[in-house]
């Protein structure tokens, strides 16, 4: 993936360890920038997670959820997997929800409900296609 995208996600927080490991998340982003990585591969990501145990645990759980289901499924099956994977990652973060975050969570719930309703029309999708459609 793109280092800038990974870095932005790490700096935004909203994940497991965002309060306690926030400085480590920022240091990882800074290291990738200093190294001028063109791509963060799975090995780079796994090495980075070694410094962030709470995020590493969440990542491991999210990947297990993602991989536990069928490779091709309908929107109504993908939606709970998306939600469970995000929850495993610690979304929406460790901070108390403010008004804006509460509204974002409501909008995400609405989006997942709309996505679920697409099941009859969309048919079976692999994970990438499901994410794109979402």
State what each model feature region is.
Residues 1-134:
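Polyanion-engaging groove/track-forming segments
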């Amino acid at each position: 993936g793109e280092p800038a995208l990974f870095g932005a996600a790490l700096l935004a927080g909203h994940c497991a360890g965002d309060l306690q490991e926030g400085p480590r998340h920022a240091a990882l982003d800074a290291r990738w920038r200093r190294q001028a990585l063109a791509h963060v591969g799975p090995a780079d990501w796994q090495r980075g997670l070694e410094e962030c145990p709470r995020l590493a645990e969440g990542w491991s759980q999210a990947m297990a959820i993602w991989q536990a289901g069928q490779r091709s499924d309908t929107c109504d099956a993908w939606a709970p997997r998306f939600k469970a994977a995000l929850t495993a990652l610690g979304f929406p973060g460790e901070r108390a929800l403010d008004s804006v975050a509460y509204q974002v969570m409501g909008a995400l719930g609405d989006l997942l409900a709309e996505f679920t309703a697409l099941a009859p029309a969309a048919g079976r999708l692999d994970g990438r296609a499901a994410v794109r459609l979402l």
